[in-house]
Amino acid sequence: MFRWGIIFLVIALIAAALGFGGLAGTAAGAAKIVFVVGIILFLVSLFMGRRRP
């Protein structure tokens, strides 16, 4: 998940540097969403892993 977030962030930075504002905003938004989902899944797996069967 974090890998995809970083990929979208790099795409957003490159698009912003080249002047593609709409694409940069879309890629930055996707990077934020993927990053938040990754954090949530990490926290869920962290707490679920500590439970006893």
From Swiss-Prot:
It is found in: Cell membrane. The chain crosses the membrane at residues 4-24, 28-48. Disulfide bonds: none annotated. Keywords: Cell membrane, Membrane, Transmembrane, Transmembrane helix. It is a multi-pass membrane protein. This is UPF0391 membrane protein ESA_03375. The keyword Thylakoid does not apply. GO terms for cellular component: plasma membrane. InterPro entries: DUF1328. Its main location: membrane. Belongs to the UPF0391 family.
